[in-house]
Amino acid sequence: MYLVAGLGLTGQSVLNYFASQGEPCYALDTRPEFDTSELEKAYPDVAFATGTLPTQWCGKIDSIVLSPGIAKSEPWVKHCINQGTEVIGDIELFARAAGKPIVAITGSNGKSTVTTLVAEALKEAGYAVGVGGNIGCPALDLLTHPTEFDVYVLELSSFQLETTYSLQTIAATVLNISEDHMDRYLALEDYIQAKMTILNNTELAVLPLDFERVGIARPGDEVRFGLNYAEALPPKEYGIVMKNGQAWLGWEDHASVPVTAMAQQGLHHQLNALAMMALCRPFDLSDAVFEKVLKTFKGLPHRTQVVLEQEGVRWINDSKGTNVGATVTAIESIKETLDGQVILIAGGVGKEADFNELGQAVVQSCRQAILFGQDKAIIAQQLPQEKIQLVDTLSEAVLLAKTIAKSGDAVLFSPACASFDQFKNYIERGNAFEAFVQQFIANEVGGKS
């Protein structure tokens, strides 16, 4: 008998999948206050429990389907493992049943963007594409979807990969590694190891050029991507091909799309595009497909999204910047495009991360860093004291940034932290930032967003 543990979106997708397969199961949510009444109506044949695992179930459970938010290190989960119970996740169930080519993407930053780019390119080439995992719908919902998909494109988090063992992919990538989720992992190496499992059974590993530097072991069959510039790149390398003095995205000696044709300019956007091209290598897509996608793709919400330009100041929502690596990348990318400097708004739940790298970026590129939220004082200890100011709330941070910013500057909201001290998630947090910008800046003088 299966136990579905965790009844959020992922757990509910597992219940739906089991119902479609006629598979009996138990269902547990470890939150004592969780209301199961609606789920009990939807799944009358399932026994539900909240809080702790009922002792009468223990001898009947062969396999636990663990939601990503529940760690395998939880005492009750470890006890079940020690008793010989299989512990898997929804992605493992998906892998066992998919039966179609899968492209899988993980990394500390850029996962959603690259996943979307790959999906858009394959759709443009005529494939029916199912997109899910850590983006959009849970992966198992793709299997019960009425569309008969030709290929699946999955964004996967380290939490999902912890409980995935038999995923076979036509192409897979670890886009990058930077410290994240140190409140869940004992060491950075554990986080890296979880990410690396995505490459265990792939036909094509797509890796950044600096993968050895970030501690990733070399797999067997691979292509690499990075910002090398050459008239002809080495075999199986994606980068910037120089042609008649112009920079093109391409591979080896093939110039595919001129950099100037991209709707999004900036080095990290070029890296995302190159990763997308490399992941599409098994499908042999045309240059015309790549160019159309990159000409029209303007980015995802809450990811270095310009929400207002007024009086020479650019206001940017990067609420999805939930770790130090993402925020440093955003600062560096945006600073390239400015005549002035960056005013950074950051803070929230720091997840026990090391913020020294952020401190270096603040020194080099920021006029000021405004910190708010639960861990602002902890973060402040690792940043240059002459460049930081502390406030309690995001609204206060926006008002303060307004007084500091000068023409040519950008106010970058890239928290480098999780959101759940003051917000439900990064989306609610980003929407709040945009609302404050409209309220305090745009509406005050009739600016246009």
UniProtKB/Swiss-Prot annotation:
Keywords: ATP-binding, Cell cycle, Cell division, Cell shape, Cell wall biogenesis/degradation, Cytoplasm, Ligase, Nucleotide-binding, Peptidoglycan synthesis. Disulfide bonds: none annotated. GO terms for biological process: cell division; cell wall organization; peptidoglycan biosynthetic process; regulation of cell shape. Its main location: cytoplasm. One of its GO terms (molecular function) is UDP-N-acetylmuramoylalanine-D-glutamate ligase activity. It is found in: Cytoplasm. Pathway: Cell wall biogenesis; peptidoglycan biosynthesis. NCBIfam families: murD. Belongs to the MurCDEF family. This is UDP-N-acetylmuramoylalanine--D-glutamate ligase. The lineage of its organism: Bacteria, Pseudomonadati, Pseudomonadota, Gammaproteobacteria, Thiotrichales.
